[in-house]
Amino acid sequence: MKLLPSVMLKLFLAAVLSALVTGESLERLRRGLAAATSNPDPPTGSTNQLLPTGGDRAQGVQDLEGTDLNLFKVAFSSKPQGLATPSKERNGKKKKKGKGLGKKRDPCLRKYKDYCIHGECRYLQEFRTPSCKCLPGYHGHRCHGLTLPVENPLYTYDHTTVLAVVAVVLSSVCLLVIVGLLMFRYHRRGGYDLESEEKVKLGVASSH
């Protein structure tokens, strides 16, 4: 319904323009006829210029039709722009203001930029406090604590058992070596004592 007045107005303007163009051509024809009736002599160059020939008339009619068609095309192709009412302008301003208020800056980017030591900062809008997502191996409110690796009890038990077995074997070897040395020394000392006794006996016998 809003488009109808603008379309009617454009059609009216097109009709007025076509009427003006047609009126000018009719006025020219009337002047030419009046000059011809007042001067019954054969038409001269000036009269020929006033009276349009058949080709000129056809060309004028085609020009008028083309002008009318162009005006009608422009009238139907152009879309009338809606009038900006104060209510629409206010609504547009409110929407722009709302969009500006909705975009809040993340406090983790400025205020709490260095809050998390070993982690990623995340601001909780509901509680209005920053929170940290710690990296693997760290814990704490600000990811400041280092988590030590926990040893496997089974692995610890196996390691201790191996050490104990190695210690027992080494101790046994040491004992065997010590016993062997003692036995070797005892046998060597016993042989030395026998030799000394024999020498003593031989010396006593020779003296007699």
Swiss-Prot record:
SUPFAM superfamilies: EGF/Laminin
Top-rank taxon, per record: Eukaryota
Post-translational events: O-glycosylated.
Glycosylation sites: 85
Compositionally biased intervals (Polar residues): 36-51
GO process terms (BP): angiogenesis; blastocyst growth; cell chemotaxis; cell migration; epidermal growth factor receptor signaling pathway; ERBB2-EGFR signaling pathway; ERBB2-ERBB4 signaling pathway; positive regulation of cell growth
Tissue: Most abundant in kidney, skeletal muscle, lung, spleen, brain and heart.
Residue stretches spanning the membrane: 161-184
Record topology, Extracellular segments: 24-160
Propeptide span(s): 24-62, 149-208
GO CC list: cell surface; extracellular region; extracellular space; plasma membrane
One Pfam family cited in the UniProt record for this chain: EGF
Domain EGF-like residue range list: 104-144
Signal sequence annotation: 1-23
Matches recorded under InterPro entries: EGF-like_dom
Annotated Basic residues bias: 91-102
Ranges of the Cytoplasmic topological domain: 185-208
Region listing for Disordered, in residue ranges: 35-57, 80-104
S-S bridge residues: 108-121, 116-132, 134-143
Entry keywords, A to Z: Cell membrane, Disulfide bond, EGF-like domain, Glycoprotein, Growth factor, Heparin-binding, Membrane, Secreted, Signal, Transmembrane, Transmembrane helix
PANTHER family, A to Z: PROHEPARIN-BINDING EGF-LIKE GROWTH FACTOR (PTHR10740:SF4), TRANSFORMING GROWTH FACTOR ALPHA (PTHR10740)
Assembly description: Interacts with FBLN1. Interacts with EGFR and ERBB4.
Protein function: Growth factor that mediates its effects via EGFR, ERBB2 and ERBB4. Required for normal cardiac valve formation and normal heart function. Promotes smooth muscle cell proliferation. May be involved in macrophage-mediated cellular proliferation. It is mitogenic for fibroblasts, but not endothelial cells. It is able to bind EGF receptor/EGFR with higher affinity than EGF itself and is a far more potent mitogen for smooth muscle cells than EGF. Also acts as a diphtheria toxin receptor.
Protein name as it appears in the record: Proheparin-binding EGF-like growth factor
Organism of derivation: Mus musculus
